């Protein structure tokens, strides 16, 4: 899951980025309001963590512009503004959730997962395809009921494909979902991850659509 984080507090921002990255999220972090606002137009983010008190542009104005321009990515407001009227205003401007500081990182992760379930119309964290089960919240994968060991990028790729079962995902989109701007990406990175997953799940689990990208095979 690729997350856009807009937070000007260096200690908080670094803690969120580091912690979520260890949990398997890909996080792009911006400290300036306007830069963060423009970033959403440049990459396919799954969700946004947005502070309200930002240099350059207030978080409420950022959110208002996004919604007016049709950006529908789920937004979690994370702020020290805890007054009832502030929370109500944020939600009415188009935020999908509102969490006040101080916070526990595990709750931030849980709320992001809940936003993704809501976006995808899912009632449970568990994703299933054939005899493969994936629980992104618990970072658990099983094959025919047996534990499956996956590297972080393999887990992220499998989650992406399972969340989009029935769709062909272009290679470029997969690359953008798996990697942040500050990560080096080799030209065959996606192909390598697909190869490793096929070795663990079976050669037919992921199907190549030549000239386009990848999709899950038949169940």
UniProtKB/Swiss-Prot annotation:
Induction, per UniProt: By the AI-2 quorum sensing system.
GO CC terms: cytosol; protein-DNA complex
Single GO biological process annotation from the record: regulation of DNA-templated transcription
Pfam families with a match to the protein in the record: Response_reg (PF00072), Trans_reg_C (PF00486)
Residue numbers carrying 4-aspartylphosphate: 51
InterPro entries: CheY-like_superfamily (IPR011006), OmpR/PhoB-type_DNA-bd (IPR001867), Sig_transdc_resp-reg_receiver (IPR001789), WalR-like (IPR039420), WH-like_DNA-bd_sf (IPR036388)
Modification after translation, per record: Phosphorylated by QseC.
Response regulatory domain location: 2-116
SUPFAM superfamilies reported in the protein's UniProt record: CheY-like (SSF52172)
Residues within the DNA-binding region(s): 124-218
Function noted in UniProt: Member of a two-component regulatory system QseB/QseC. Activates the flagella regulon by activating transcription of FlhDC. Currently it is not known whether this effect is direct or not.
PANTHER family: REGULATOR OF RPOS, TRANSCRIPTIONAL REGULATORY PROTEIN QSEB
Protein name according to UniProt: Transcriptional regulatory protein QseB
Record gene name: qseB
